[in-house]
Protein backbone atom coordinates (compact mmCIF):
# COMPACT_ATOMS: atom_id res chain seq x y z
CA UNK A 1 0.00 0.00 0.00
CA UNK A 2 1.28 3.44 -0.94
CA UNK A 3 0.20 6.75 0.54
CA UNK A 4 0.61 9.53 -2.04
CA UNK A 5 0.60 13.27 -1.53
CA UNK A 6 1.85 16.46 -3.12
CA UNK A 7 2.87 19.75 -1.55
CA UNK A 8 4.03 22.98 -3.11
CA UNK A 9 7.59 24.23 -2.76
CA UNK A 10 8.71 27.69 -3.86
CA UNK A 11 11.98 27.77 -5.76
CA UNK A 12 13.17 31.21 -6.85
CA UNK A 13 9.66 32.55 -6.47
CA UNK A 14 8.08 29.88 -8.68
CA UNK A 15 5.70 27.28 -7.33
CA UNK A 16 6.75 23.65 -7.87
CA UNK A 17 5.04 20.54 -6.57
CA UNK A 18 6.78 17.87 -4.56
CA UNK A 19 5.08 14.51 -5.09
CA UNK A 20 5.79 11.92 -2.40
CA UNK A 21 4.96 8.23 -2.01
CA UNK A 22 5.18 6.59 1.41
CA UNK A 23 4.61 2.91 2.12
CA UNK A 24 2.48 1.45 4.92
CA UNK A 25 5.47 1.46 7.30
CA UNK A 26 6.20 5.16 6.82
CA UNK A 27 9.25 4.66 4.60
CA UNK A 28 9.56 7.08 1.70
CA UNK A 29 9.19 5.17 -1.56
CA UNK A 30 10.01 8.09 -3.86
CA UNK A 31 9.91 11.87 -4.16
CA UNK A 32 9.56 13.76 -7.42
CA UNK A 33 9.59 17.50 -8.05
CA UNK A 34 7.48 18.84 -10.93
CA UNK A 35 6.25 22.21 -12.12
CA UNK A 36 2.63 21.09 -12.48
CA UNK A 37 -0.04 19.26 -10.50
CA UNK A 38 -2.26 17.94 -13.28
CA UNK A 39 -3.08 14.47 -14.60
CA UNK A 40 0.05 14.32 -16.80
CA UNK A 41 2.25 15.14 -13.80
CA UNK A 42 0.52 12.41 -11.77
CA UNK A 43 1.06 9.92 -14.61
CA UNK A 44 4.77 10.83 -14.76
CA UNK A 45 5.05 10.24 -11.01
CA UNK A 46 3.21 6.90 -11.24
CA UNK A 47 5.42 5.77 -14.14
CA UNK A 48 8.48 6.65 -12.08
CA UNK A 49 7.13 4.65 -9.11
CA UNK A 50 6.27 1.65 -11.27
CA UNK A 51 9.67 1.73 -12.99
CA UNK A 52 11.50 1.72 -9.66
CA UNK A 53 9.34 -0.99 -8.07
CA UNK A 54 8.34 -3.13 -11.02
CA UNK A 55 4.86 -3.89 -9.66
CA UNK A 56 1.88 -1.82 -8.70
CA UNK A 57 0.65 -1.81 -5.09
CA UNK A 58 -2.55 -3.50 -4.02
CA UNK A 59 -3.94 -0.17 -2.78
CA UNK A 60 -3.11 3.54 -2.93
CA UNK A 61 -4.31 6.17 -0.47
CA UNK A 62 -4.44 9.79 -1.63
CA UNK A 63 -6.11 13.08 -0.90
CA UNK A 64 -9.02 14.14 -3.09
CA UNK A 65 -6.93 15.56 -5.96
CA UNK A 66 -8.56 14.29 -9.16
CA UNK A 67 -5.24 13.76 -10.95
CA UNK A 68 -4.55 10.65 -8.87
CA UNK A 69 -7.72 8.95 -10.08
CA UNK A 70 -6.97 9.72 -13.73
CA UNK A 71 -3.41 8.40 -13.45
CA UNK A 72 -4.47 5.30 -11.52
CA UNK A 73 -7.16 4.39 -14.06
CA UNK A 74 -4.66 4.81 -16.91
CA UNK A 75 -1.63 3.04 -15.40
CA UNK A 76 -2.82 0.83 -12.52
CA UNK A 77 -6.46 -0.10 -13.19
CA UNK A 78 -6.37 -3.12 -10.85
CA UNK A 79 -5.15 -1.06 -7.86
CA UNK A 80 -7.72 -0.03 -5.24
CA UNK A 81 -7.90 3.75 -4.70
CA UNK A 82 -8.92 5.21 -1.35
CA UNK A 83 -9.28 8.94 -0.80
CA UNK A 84 -11.14 8.94 2.51
CA UNK A 85 -10.76 11.89 4.84
CA UNK A 86 -7.77 11.60 7.21
CA UNK A 87 -6.65 8.31 5.61
CA UNK A 88 -3.67 10.05 4.03
CA UNK A 89 -2.14 11.40 7.25
CA UNK A 90 0.93 9.17 6.87
CA UNK A 91 1.91 10.93 3.63
CA UNK A 92 0.94 14.36 4.95
CA UNK A 93 3.18 13.90 8.00
CA UNK A 94 6.09 12.69 5.88
CA UNK A 95 6.46 16.23 4.51
CA UNK A 96 7.48 17.61 7.92
CA UNK A 97 11.15 16.54 7.87
CA UNK A 98 11.45 17.94 4.34
CA UNK A 99 10.02 21.28 5.42
CA UNK A 100 12.47 21.41 8.33
CA UNK A 101 15.41 20.71 6.00
CA UNK A 102 14.12 23.26 3.51
CA UNK A 103 14.04 25.95 6.21
CA UNK A 104 17.53 24.99 7.37
CA UNK A 105 18.87 25.33 3.84
CA UNK A 106 17.09 28.70 3.40
CA UNK A 107 15.01 27.28 0.55
CA UNK A 108 16.16 25.45 -2.55
CA UNK A 109 18.13 27.28 -5.22
CA UNK A 110 16.99 25.29 -8.27
CA UNK A 111 14.62 22.43 -9.11
CA UNK A 112 17.55 20.15 -9.99
CA UNK A 113 19.27 20.84 -6.66
CA UNK A 114 15.99 20.27 -4.81
CA UNK A 115 15.40 16.93 -6.57
CA UNK A 116 18.93 15.72 -5.80
CA UNK A 117 18.67 16.74 -2.16
CA UNK A 118 15.18 15.34 -1.61
CA UNK A 119 16.03 11.98 -3.20
CA UNK A 120 19.12 11.63 -1.00
CA UNK A 121 17.23 12.86 2.07
CA UNK A 122 14.55 10.18 1.54
CA UNK A 123 17.17 7.41 1.59
CA UNK A 124 18.79 8.76 4.75
CA UNK A 125 15.40 9.28 6.39
CA UNK A 126 14.42 5.66 5.69
CA UNK A 127 17.69 4.47 7.20
CA UNK A 128 17.15 6.35 10.47
CA UNK A 129 13.33 6.06 10.69
CA UNK A 130 13.24 3.11 13.07
CA UNK A 131 9.55 3.03 14.10
CA UNK A 132 10.39 3.24 17.79
CA UNK A 133 6.84 2.64 18.98
CA UNK A 134 6.88 -0.87 17.49
CA UNK A 135 9.93 -2.18 19.37
CA UNK A 136 11.21 -2.69 22.89
CA UNK A 137 13.93 -0.35 24.13
CA UNK A 138 16.63 -3.04 23.87
CA UNK A 139 15.65 -3.96 20.31
CA UNK A 140 15.47 -0.27 19.33
CA UNK A 141 18.99 0.35 20.69
CA UNK A 142 20.28 -2.68 18.76
CA UNK A 143 18.68 -1.47 15.52
CA UNK A 144 19.97 2.07 16.07
CA UNK A 145 23.51 0.77 16.65
CA UNK A 146 23.28 -1.27 13.43
CA UNK A 147 21.98 1.76 11.55
CA UNK A 148 24.86 3.95 12.70
CA UNK A 149 27.32 1.19 11.81
CA UNK A 150 25.92 1.04 8.26
CA UNK A 151 25.93 4.84 8.06
CA UNK A 152 29.58 5.05 9.14
CA UNK A 153 30.54 2.40 6.57
CA UNK A 154 28.70 4.27 3.82
CA UNK A 155 30.21 7.63 4.72
CA UNK A 156 33.74 6.23 5.05
CA UNK A 157 33.60 4.62 1.61
Where are these regions (language model features)?
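Residue-level recognition of single "structural anchor" positions
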Residues: 1-157
Amino acid sequence: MWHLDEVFVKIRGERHYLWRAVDQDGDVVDVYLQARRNAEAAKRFFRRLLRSHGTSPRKIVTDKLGSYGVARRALMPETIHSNDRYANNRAELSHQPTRARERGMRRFSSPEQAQRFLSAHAVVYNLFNLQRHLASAAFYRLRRARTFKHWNEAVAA
